[in-house]
Curated annotation (Swiss-Prot):
UniProt GO MF annotations: ubiquitin-protein transferase activity
Pathway entry: Protein modification; protein ubiquitination
Catalytic reaction list: S-ubiquitinyl-[E2 ubiquitin-conjugating enzyme]-L-cysteine + [acceptor protein]-L-lysine = [E2 ubiquitin-conjugating enzyme]-L-cysteine + N(6)-ubiquitinyl-[acceptor protein]-L-lysine
Stated role: Functions as an E3 ubiquitin ligase.
Enzyme Commission numbers on file: 2.3.2.27
Compositionally biased intervals (Polar residues): 180-189
PANTHER family listed in its UniProt record: U BOX DOMAIN-CONTAINING, U-BOX DOMAIN-CONTAINING PROTEIN 39
Organism: Arabidopsis thaliana
Name of this protein: U-box domain-containing protein 39
Family matches, as SMART domains: ARM, Ubox
Record carries keyword Cell wall biogenesis/degradation: no
Stretches for region Disordered: 167-205
Keywords recorded for this protein, A-Z: Repeat, Transferase, Ubl conjugation pathway
Length: 531
């Protein structure tokens, strides 16, 4: 956008008078990387946060916009979703390092009144349509229309708790890092200063004991403190809540990225245990753990990666965390773990984490763009984690990008083949139902499906399912709906939205339905997978 690109959005704010104490320090646009500047103030960010739509802003800027019920239109024409805010610790660290290298002062938070003045001026000066006033309900974190019932939630968390209780290998079997020093020269540095802690509630004896070990100068104390935290939170729900404090979380943020395998592994396992309780899930994510968990997933030890995948699964169960975890980049490393992890449990947890993330539309698109569909279809062919993969494919088939990728990837033939392989085996009942569910989702409002299903011989196997004495009523109901689609629902070309779409295509081609019926079988225009 030339020289007007970065500051065009708020170019007027330089004319507002402000004292040095209220106006944040300004850095030359030619020297400061664009991504370090808040899109609203145009200044170096002191406390960067990621919003739900993926952009990074100064925290106070987001707070002002939310308080004024205003969603700014950015210079690229987009309007950010301010419903969720998560600290961008990686960006903050990068900015501070950049300042140190360039011998610049660290950025200070802008004055609230100054930012409010900037935003209000923007609201008053923009032409109609350039900004967007929104209702409070649009700014507050969204609530899913079809949220999981308590029984569903309890079922999922019961599985995670069971996994946590059985996952702890003997702590003495964990290898110590060969180069581990006996002592550190400094104590563990958390993101809080001692003065910050003075305003916190007093510690319980249990928390104080763990806290003292985690802040010790001795690495062995760190290990012992983490092992104690891990064991204490493994099965006691009350303790999991009481020990999920800002103090402990701050120390865990430092320890989870430790270069010592045993420290990193026990820190990750402790996060899994703490995340089991619903009140802790939002707290952990809002404390900035997701980027750290992703880093460990990409480059940590094998056992630490396994625990991190379990933590992401547990955190993704919470509705308000799904968007944030997706925005911060968990999808691709989870897909890699699903495909390549040596641990069966890690692969299963990765599939479940991705399933819960895919319950919201934005994450479905991320999965499709990351190449999830061909990868998962390949796994279905080889029989890997079939039931859970099929659940994921059901979700992806619900979005247009996913449905298109599945049809292009020969999903109908693969799914029908999977049904034939499973037969009526009780052991494959879940996979069969998920397989039929995926086919049903693909069939909805899609003209290509009928031809592809016919080529794959779907009608025969689906008829067997409906007429079989075994199988659940839900399975038979889904199969019946697909058969109705294949048989035209009382009309050769179907009814409703599909028929209307078909007629529009025929009219656009200059053909009538009768012309198509007469000539379509002679090679000119076949309703098949080539369509």
């Amino acid at each position: 956008m030339g020289d007007t690109g970065r500051h065009k959005w708020f170019s007027f704010h330089h004319h507002r008078s402000a004292s040095a104490t209220t106006m944040p320090q300004h850095n030359s646009p030619g020297e400061t990387p664009t991504e370090f500047l808040c899109p609203i103030t145009g200044f170096l960010m002191s406390d960067p946060v990621v919003v739900a739509s993926g952009q990074t802003f100064e925290r106070i800027s987001v707070q002002v916009c939310r308080n004024l019920s205003f969603a700014p239109k950015l210079h690229d024409g987009t309007q950010p979703d301010l419903s969720t805010v998560i600290p961008n610790l990686a960006m903050k660290s990068t900015i501070l390092s950049w300042c140190d290298r360039n011998k610049m002062e660290h950025p200070r938070p802008p004055d609230y009144a100054y930012v409010e003045g900037v935003v209000r001026t923007r609201m008053d000066s923009l032409p109609p349509g350039s900004g967007h006033r929104i209702a409070k309900s649009e700014i507050l974190p969204p609530v899913a229309e079809n949220s999981n019932s308590n029984s569903d939630y309890d079922s999922v968390m019961g599985a995670i708790r069971s996994r946590s209780r059985t996952s702890l290998s003997s702590t003495t079997s964990l290898p110590l890092h060969q180069t581990r020093p006996i002592n550190h020269s400094t104590r563990i540095q958390s993101s809080f200063s001692t003065s910050d802690y003075s305003s916190f509630p007093p510690m319980s004896p249990e928390e104080e004991e763990i806290y003292n070990k985690l802040t010790s100068v001795d690495t062995i104390d760190h290990e012992q403190g983490l092992i104690q935290l891990r064991k204490t939170t493994r099965s006691n729900e009350t303790t999991r809540i009481s020990l999920c404090t800002d103090r402990i979380l701050s120390l865990l943020r430092s320890l989870i990225v430790s270069r010592y395998n045993i420290v990193q592994t026990n820190a990750a396992a402790s996060i899994v245990n703490l995340s089991l309780e619903k009140p802790n899930k939002l707290k952990i994510v809002r404390s900035g753990f997701v980027p750290l968990l992703i880093d460990v997933l990409k480059s940590g030890s094998t056992e630490a990666q396994e625990h991190v995948i379990g933590a992401l699964f547990s955190l993704a169960v919470e509705e308000e965390n799904k968007m944030v975890i997706g925005v911060l980049g968990a999808v691709e490393p989870l897909l890699h773990a699903l495909r390549s992890s040596e641990s069966e449990r890690a692969r299963q947890d990765a599939a479940l984490a991705l399933y819960h993330l895919s319950l919201i539309p934005n994450n479905r698109s991320r999965l499709v763009k990351a190449g999830a569909v061909p990868m998962m279809l390949s796994m279905i062919r080889s029989g890997e984690s079939a039931s859970r993969i099929l659940l994921l494919l059901c979700n992806l088939a619900a979005c247009s990008e996913g449905k298109g990728a599945m049809l292009d990837g020969n999903a109908v033939s693969i799914l029908v083949g999977k049904l034939r392989e499973s037969g009526g085996a009780e052991s494959d009942a879940a996979a069969r139902e998920n397989c039929v569910g995926a086919l049903l989702t693909l069939s909805v409002g899609n003209m290509r499906f009928r031809g592809l299903a016919s080529e794959a011989g779907a009608e025969e196997i689906l008829t067997e399912i409906v007429e079989s004495e075994s199988g659940s009523g839900r399975l038979k109901e889904k199969a019946s709906k697909i058969l109705q689609t294949l048989r035209g629902g009382g009309s050769e070309f179907g009814e409703g939205a599909e028929a209307r779409e078909w007629n529009r295509m025929l009219e656009a081609s200059g053909l009538s339905r009768s012309q198509f019926q007469q000539g379509g079988q002679k090679g000119g225009f076949a309703y098949s997978s080539q369509f």
